[in-house]
């Protein structure tokens, strides 16, 4: 039982972290954004007009900043080697900006309606249990012994 002094102390509550939006909601928000507004692919520090002037191409990332974010160190030779490859990948993603999504209906998975297409999760009994037990190399009733997966020493 709490004392009178302890019950008089206000209880602190932790603020709940903001909930992340689902991927579908994020996609819908991006889809609703008009093409005339600031494009979502503009990198910070680059004006939207400069990005739009690049004929829809994405700006290649700053390689030292990217390496720092990935927690890797690159020598100048490695940076020289990877720069064209990264530029090529960024160009591939830049081509996605030309895809017309206005006529595409949103769906959770390709080829399905926006709904639950999964079967009901209910237990089913397996009728041929003996066939499984016969094919198992090591069986100790009621357990099936399997080799160790993690090598903990």
Curated annotation (Swiss-Prot):
InterPro entries: Asp/Glu-ADT_sf_sub_c, GatC. GO terms for molecular function: ATP binding; glutaminyl-tRNA synthase (glutamine-hydrolyzing) activity. GO terms for biological process: glutaminyl-tRNAGln biosynthesis via transamidation; mitochondrial translation; regulation of translational fidelity. Disulfide bonds: none annotated. It catalyses: L-glutamyl-tRNA(Gln) + L-glutamine + ATP + H2O = L-glutaminyl-tRNA(Gln) + L-glutamate + ADP + phosphate + H(+). Its EC number is 6.3.5.-. Keywords: ATP-binding, Chloroplast, Ligase, Mitochondrion, Nucleotide-binding, Plastid, Protein biosynthesis. Pfam families: GatC (PF02686). One of its GO terms (cellular component) is chloroplast. Its main location: mitochondrion. It is an enzyme of class 6 (ligase). It is found in: Mitochondrion; Plastid, Chloroplast. This protein may be expected to contain an N-terminal transit peptide but none has been predicted. Belongs to the GatC family. Subunit of the heterotrimeric GatCAB amidotransferase (AdT) complex, composed of A, B and C subunits. Allows the formation of correctly charged Gln-tRNA(Gln) through the transamidation of misacylated Glu-tRNA(Gln) in chloroplasts and mitochondria. The reaction takes place in the presence of glutamine and ATP through an activated gamma-phospho-Glu-tRNA(Gln). PANTHER family: GLUTAMYL-TRNA(GLN) AMIDOTRANSFERASE SUBUNIT C, MITOCHONDRIAL. This is Glutamyl-tRNA(Gln) amidotransferase subunit C, chloroplastic/mitochondrial. The gene is GATC.
């Amino acid at each position: 039982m709490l004392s009178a002094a302890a019950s008089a102390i206000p209880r602190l509550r932790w603020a709940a972290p903001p909930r992340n939006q689902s991927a579908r909601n994020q996609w819908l928000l991006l889809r609703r954004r008009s093409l005339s507004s600031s494009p979502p692919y503009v990198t910070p520090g680059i004006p939207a007009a400069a990005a739009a002037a690049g004929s829809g191409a994405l700006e290649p990332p700053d390689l030292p900043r990217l390496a720092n974010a990935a927690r890797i160190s690159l020598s100048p030779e490695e940076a020289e080697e990877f720069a064209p490859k990264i530029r090529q990948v960024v160009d591939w993603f830049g081509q996605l900006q030309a895809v017309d999504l206005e006529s595409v209906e949103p769906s959770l998975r390709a080829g399905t309606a926006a709904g639950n297409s999964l079967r009901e999760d209910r237990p089913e009994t397996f009728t041929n249990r003996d066939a499984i037990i016969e094919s198992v190399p090591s069986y100790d009733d009621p357990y099936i012994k399997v080799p160790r997966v993690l090598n903990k020493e």
